[in-house]
Structures are given as C-alpha cells and as structure tokens.
C-alpha cells in the first residue's frame, strides 16, 4: 500500500477515535439535544441505533430517541429542583440541566477497520462505565458493562455515525 494511502487510513482511524470520544462526552455532558445533528450521518441510507432498551430505524426514530432523552433530563432537573429547593434556590432549570446524573462510558479495547474504498468503516469498543440516576425513589448508582459496535460513513468531508449498537 502506498505511503499516502497508509497515512490517510491512519488519519481516518484517528478521526473515528475522536468522533466516538466526542460522542461519549456529549452523552456525559447531557447534550442529547444536539447529538443527532453533530455526530450522525444525514444522507446515508437506513441509519439505525440499537440499545438494550430498543431499536431505532431511520432518521426520525433516532432523532426521537435523543429528544426523549433530552425531555427526561428536563423532567429530572425539575424533580431535583423540587426535592432540593433550598440548595437550588436562585438557579434556573437551564443552569441545573443534567445535574444529579452521571452517565460515563469510557472507551477501551478499540478495533477500527477502514473499508478498502475509504467510504465506510467499522469500529468496536468495550465499555466499563458508571451511571448515577436520580428519580422519585432517590439516588441510584450502578456499574455498566457493554460494547459499542459502530458503522461509520464518510459524508460531506467527515466521518459520521451510520449504525450504532450499544449493548
């Protein structure tokens, strides 16, 4: 393989690593409202999102999933403001958005393969994470163990998520 092609593949791998890192940080920072537009493909055929909680096929279904997560964060913020009114007094819901919850998914043991034509790629990551929730029964904390399997597509000069499975 010519040196230029090897360098391009190395750069593609680095861009995909960074894309997934930014995606998981966006989850951690509760930026679900913007995740679809920033990280997901916008033109490729049949994008899908697979999770233990459901399988979402098509642009509308995936957007609806992230919107539902955003609405859940809004609801949780209001609940925390109500339950901890003295500690949150003077703060707006926008300032407190995402508080009380930690959804950390550090990526490890990556495998990234770029297709021969350089237009698609596959990636796999093992995840040992931690989640903290706050609900009507109070705080809950637990470990999560899972795997990301992701197909990427080169679209408009950048790598984008095309199919993502997290189980």
Residue ranges, per PLM feature:
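Short, low-complexity N-terminal intrinsically disordered segments enriched in polar/charged residues
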Residues: 1-42
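A structural signal for alpha-helical segments
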Residues: 11, 54-57, 140
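Short, glycine/acidic-rich beta->alpha junctions
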Residues: 15, 104, 142-144
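Short, hydrophobic/aromatic alpha-helical segments in well-folded domains
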Residues: 19-22, 108, 147-151
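Short beta-strand segments enriched in hydrophobic/aromatic residues
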Residues: 27, 40, 127-129, 165-166
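A solvent-exposed, acidic/Ser-Thr-rich amphipathic alpha-helical stretch
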Residues: 32-128
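Short beta-strand edge/turn micro-motifs at domain boundaries
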Residues: 120-124, 143-167
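Short, cysteine-centered beta-strand-loop-beta hairpins and adjacent loop/turn segments enriched
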Residues: 129-141
């Amino acid at each position: 393989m010519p040196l230029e092609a090897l360098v391009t593949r190395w750069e593609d791998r680095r861009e995909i690593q960074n894309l997934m890192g930014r995606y998981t940080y966006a989850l951690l920072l509760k930026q679900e409202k913007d995740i679809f537009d920033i990280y997901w493909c916008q033109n490729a055929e049949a994008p899908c999102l697979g999770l233990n909680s459901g399988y979402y096929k098509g642009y509308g279904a995936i957007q609806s999933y992230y919107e539902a997560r955003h609405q859940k964060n809004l609801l949780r913020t209001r609940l925390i403001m109500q339950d901890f009114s003295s500690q949150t007094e003077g703060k707006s819901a926008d300032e407190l958005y995402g508080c009380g919850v930690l959804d950390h998914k550090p990526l490890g043991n990556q495998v990234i393969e770029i297709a021969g034509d350089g237009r698609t790629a596959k990636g796999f990551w093992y995840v040992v994470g931690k989640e903290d929730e706050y609900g009507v029964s109070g705080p809950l904390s637990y470990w999560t163990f899972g795997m990301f399997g992701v197909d990427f597509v080169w679209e408009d000069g950048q790598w984008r998520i095309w199919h993502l499975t997290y189980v």
